[in-house]
């Protein structure tokens, strides 16, 4: 089951999947065509439950095993999978990223195609468990600020040092993934294809993505991640944020070079707060 959430992903995603052999694709009709008003999904973000609900309804009617949804500009992809009781569970970007990282690395090792000095790039708000998976396969982790442009920047730096071929995978917790160095930004088409390949591989062994995720937790440690967004709308919201930032800056003893704060509560539990202007 696939939804473009009334965005641009329909043609590139479905064409790519069909050309790669995934032809049994059902599309969510109400969200098929681009529509900037987003009539069925006021907040077309594949990270959130509300955006995926119509797709889940379709998936349940069609008995689909996997639901894919790309955001309007098709650079991010979210998924929901069927659990043991037939209900659909939305995976977080962190969970999907962990699964993809392990799958890509394990397949490279299995087929003798692991790169020299392999590298995984992630944002600092992305789950730390990914570093343990990367280390298991011999990958070096590069942590960067939030924003996939910084992952692209690292690919550029690797390229300048003649090490672009060492890039294996990059992702951020907001459902952005990139499996190669051919572009400098997250790619929903690439992500959708790799998710389908991974899903098919495990399905052939009668292993669900939820089962595989549980297996990873048992090996590398159980993790919990949640995302909370707080909106400050309009000019009043902007003014409130500006006053708050100025007030905090006046009381701060040291300069803050990044638009985020990371709090270590009880190690390894941490929380990150960051601002984002839309």
Identify what each model region corresponds to.
Residues 50-54, 100, 150:
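Well-ordered alpha-helical segments embedded in enzymatic catalytic cores
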Residues 4-10, 74-76, 125-128, 235:
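Gly/Ser/Thr-rich loops at beta-strand to alpha-helix junctions
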Residues 1-22, 31:
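Active-site pocket-lining segments that scaffold enzyme catalytic pockets across diverse folds
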Residues 21-78:
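N-terminal small/polar loop signature for handling phosphorylated ligands or for N-terminal nucleophile
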Residues 15-27, 131-137:
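Short helix-loop-beta junction
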Residues 23-27, 87-106, 191-194:
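Gly/Ser/Thr-rich active-site loops/lids in small-molecule metabolic enzymes
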Residues 13, 75-94, 130:
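Short Gly/Thr/Asp-enriched flexible loops that form oxyanion-binding sites at enzyme active sites
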Residues 60, 64-66, 87-89, 107-278:
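Phosphate-binding and adjacent anionic-ligand microenvironments
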């Amino acid at each position: 089951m696939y939804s473009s959430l009334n965005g641009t992903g329909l043609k590139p995603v479905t064409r790519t999947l069909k050309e790669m052999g995934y032809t049994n694709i059902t599309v969510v009709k109400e969200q098929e065509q681009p529509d900037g008003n987003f009539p069925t999904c006021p907040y077309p973000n594949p990270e959130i439950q509300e955006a995926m609900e119509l797709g889940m309804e379709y998936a349940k009617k069609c008995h689909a095993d996997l639901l894919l949804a790309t955001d309007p500009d098709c650079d991010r992809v979210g998924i929901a999978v069927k659990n043991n009781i037939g209900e659909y569970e939305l995976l977080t970007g962190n969970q999907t990223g962990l699964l993809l990282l392990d799958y890509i690395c394990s397949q490279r090792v299995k087929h003798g195609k692991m790169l020299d000095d392999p590298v995984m790039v992630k944002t600092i708000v992305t789950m730390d468990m990914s570093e343990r998976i990367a280390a298991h396969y011999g990958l070096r982790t590069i942590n960067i600020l939030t924003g996939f442009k910084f992952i692209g920047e690292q690919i550029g730096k690797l390229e300048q040092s003649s090490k672009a071929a060492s890039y294996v995978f990059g992702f951020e917790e907001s459902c952005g993934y990139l499996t190669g160095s051919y572009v400098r930004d997250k790619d929903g088409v690439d992500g959708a294809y790799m998710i389908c390949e991974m899903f098919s591989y495990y399905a052939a062994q009668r292993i669900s993505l939820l089962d595989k995720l549980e297996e990873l937790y048992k090996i590398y440690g159980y993790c919990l991640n949640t995302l909370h967004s707080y909106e400050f709308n309009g000019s009043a919201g902007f003014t409130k944020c500006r006053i708050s930032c100025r007030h905090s800056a006046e009381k701060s003893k040291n300069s803050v070079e990044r638009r985020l704060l990371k709090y270590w509560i009880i190690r390894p539990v941490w929380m990150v707060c960051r601002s984002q202007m839309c």
